[in-house]
Amino acid sequence: YVSNRKQTQSSDMVLADCGAEYQNYTADITRTFPINGKYTPEQRIIYNIVLEAQDSGIVASRAGNAFKDPHKRAMEVVQKRLMELEIIKKPEEAKWYFNHGTSHYLGLDVHDAGTGTALKPNSVITVEPGVYIPEGSPCNKKWWNIGVRIEDDILITEGDPINLSVRVPRKAEDIERLMESKTMP
């Protein structure tokens, strides 16, 4: 929903893509949370698919891997899971619902330049898969109007990637617990 002309309903979710700038360097993260503090069963399923896709993309965020490797890994998860749910019939149909890249570099611009090279130590990328199922999609109506994106900032190292935004809750149950407590940890 992008028109921004209607009041949110209790069963809606909000996708918040937020950023900051510090000493001319930028960063952004995204979370998707339920207005009423609890994901519906269908929202939770899609949320967990996106989280699994993000985890897979983060694992692929290693020095020497291609910039597109996190996207390939995330897309594989989305394809498999949406087929299992019969939301899509063929893997290539996942592009209907996951229709953007998974990563961008962070630096002097929030969407810093670069896509074609191998990932290098000390660079920072985002890993931000998303699944967005609009009303009227050729799937069961229970999936309509669910959109989820989860974005974190990942430091490429000589070893394992480091999630720089790890303190911001990512799991559905952690977000629900945070919303119930109404305080930040």
Roles of regions detected by a PLM:
Residues Y1-P185:
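Active-site neighborhoods and metal-handling regions in enzymes and metal-associated proteins
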